[in-house]
């Protein structure tokens, strides 16, 4: 993906491949793997999730994907926020009766996402607030002594505990999701214990990819969820526009 963004060719053996050629090879191999699960059925759509949606990158990926899968296959691009929204919406409703938190642990620290729903609006308007915590950047502990590791992990645990406590105190949170290999039991002790009090907590790495699949299905085969809940991203107008109308003798909104 870095080659695609930089529009840089790559040398493989004696041949030089353009970014589009490399992605086309990738898509063909990927489709070969999925053939065992689809039983030879044609794919209706391919969904890709990217941290940032860049037009040039998306255009190249769309061309490569369409060339590999065929023009009948729709190509969708979804942000991590949209994938988070779609994933949560397709979970049991008791998991999102209140706000939902997601902590994504990357190399540069923790990125948090908070899903909020305004259930007084029709359709239900959903917003996602984001925040970055660079102070949680993971350090290489391979050269540390056991005592140094313990001290570092304790400091990390206390820092994350402060982050979740500052948010959760006085608020209603139904569930929280921890993404990334850096969330381990080596350090995530007091913070995890606090987070699990009265909330459902899950850990994994494939939430965004699953959310992309749910989102693609909603675009191809819309369910009632698509009309009942609307996610307002940064590209959308953050306002509800409504008016009172007369239906017979009754006034409705």
Can you say where each PLM-predicted feature lies in the sequence?
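ATP/nucleotide-binding catalytic cores
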Residues: 53, 61-69, 89-92, 98-103, ...
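Conserved phosphate-binding loops in N-terminal lobes of ATP-dependent enzymes
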Residues: 1-50, 54, 129-166, 173
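Acidic, glycine/GT-rich loop-and beta-edge segments that sit at the periphery of enzyme/chaperone cores
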Residues: 207, 214-253
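Alpha-helical scaffold elements adjacent to nucleotide-binding pockets in ATP/GTP-utilizing enzyme cores
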Residues: 26, 60-67, 191, 211, ...
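Early-domain small/polar-rich strand-loop-helix modules and first-structured segments
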Residues: 1-13, 66, 74-86
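Conserved phosphate-binding catalytic cores of ATP/NTP-utilizing and phosphoryl-transfer enzymes
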Residues: 70-103, 207-225
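Gly/Thr-rich phosphate-binding beta-strand-loop-beta motif of the actin/hexokinase/Hsp70
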Residues: 1-6, 88-130, 244
